Amino acid sequence: MRPLTLPRASSRKFLLLSGLALAAGAFLLTGGGSSPAAAGPLTPDGVVCTYGSEGQASTTQTFTLTARDGHITTPDGNTVYMWGFADGKGTFQYPGPNLCVKQGDRVRVILKNTLAAKTSIVFPGQSGVTADGVAAAPVLDGGGAITSLTPTADANGGSVTYSFVADAPGTYAYTSGTDEAVQTQMGLFGALIVRPAQGAAFAYNAARTEFDPTTEFVQVLSDLDPAIHNAVEQGRTPNILAIHPRYWMINGRSFPDTIAPNNATWLPNQPYNALIHTVANPSKPAIVRYVNVTSVSHPMHPHGDHGRVIGRDGALLAGPNGEDLSHEDFAIEVGPGQTVDALYGWEDTGNWSDPSPAAHPTLPDQPAALDTLHLSGDTWWSGSRFLGQQDKTNFPPGITVYNQCGEYYQVSHSHALNEVTNYGAAMGGMLTLWRIDPINHFDCA
């Protein structure tokens, strides 16, 4: 396990690292949706679900999404003007709420628009979508050109209600269907999770897709070109053909903000974190639901493990007779507009939970291992190579150690390394951490 270190913390970094320490404990946070009854419990890490106003158990799920503008911050101190979907009367957020429903639910989405431009929502993968009770169809101008993929909510107060039956389980996106290249870039998107009839611990109606519901994660992949956003904020027409992303994000954040807990107070409009948190030798795997709303592919790669891809675009990977077509990947390719469901289980194949010398015999005639430990600043390393062990005598004075109980931290990132930057500065962007707790000690309990 390579020790992970960062430069000495600024005041914002101190808040971030303190937030990670909180995320390591068994804390619950509050907030999120405009209606407490409609929102799921907020945890320091993992998926945060928003449920319909009728409550999670109802077979009708009604959501109100309000298109608003606002600002987000980036780890390098930049502030960027955005659009986004708020939960009802809630504040602007980026990305929009994670809408969680059950297979067979009647889903109603009321879109209210406070922006100075028309907007809309499309639901890729959903069939029979209606808008204000009429089959949703593209909107044409007088010359027959498409101006929107679906009926819109007028600017400055317009509204439209979409409805459909969520008949197929899986992971989906919802995005603007109006001037979609610009409006999706501005932030009008979110994730939709349809849970199968077989139960919330399954990704699809197949036993092989079972996962641990306490280790469920959504990673919405987006990019951001400040020039486009500046043009919109200033009332100019953006040149979307000249787009040049400067930031790459997971759940609306770039590293190191990706590892701050859900609802971090210093990221008020970016509520969702991207830390993957599992336990070694799990009885059931974790699931990561990837949602790509960009126009390019992202090869997502966690160090130290492969992911088993079980579904793509809301469809179980199965043959015509139900054959299991899932497969393991070193880097999981998430194409433009695609969603991918992958299972992960970190197995202690090297027996790193046992620090006894007998468990790790020294090979004969090998070069001596020299102590080359040089650390500065803050670290999540335990000081020991063994899972579940800590040795803080390995650290010189002045090191702040955030490790809780000898857990491991692995890097998980886009393997398109230009995307692991914040405005060109390395070790940022579409990157997060994967925390592995000792066997049978999730959250160090």
Question: Which role fits each region the language model picked out?
Answer:
Residues 4-18:
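Bacterial N-terminal signal peptides that target proteins for export
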Residues 17-30:
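Bacterial N-terminal signal peptides
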Residues 27-152, 158-161, 233-287, 319-322, ...:
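N-terminal, post-signal-peptide metal-ligating segments of extracellular/periplasmic oxidoreductases
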Residues 65, 109, 121, 176, ...:
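Divalent metal-coordination and catalytic microenvironments
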Residues 115-119, 126-130, 137-202, 324-445:
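Extracellular/periplasmic metallocenter environments
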Residues 204-235:
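Compositionally biased low-complexity segments at domain edges in trafficked proteins
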Residues 296:
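Aromatic-residue-lined binding/catalytic grooves and analogous aromatic/hydrophobic interfacial grooves
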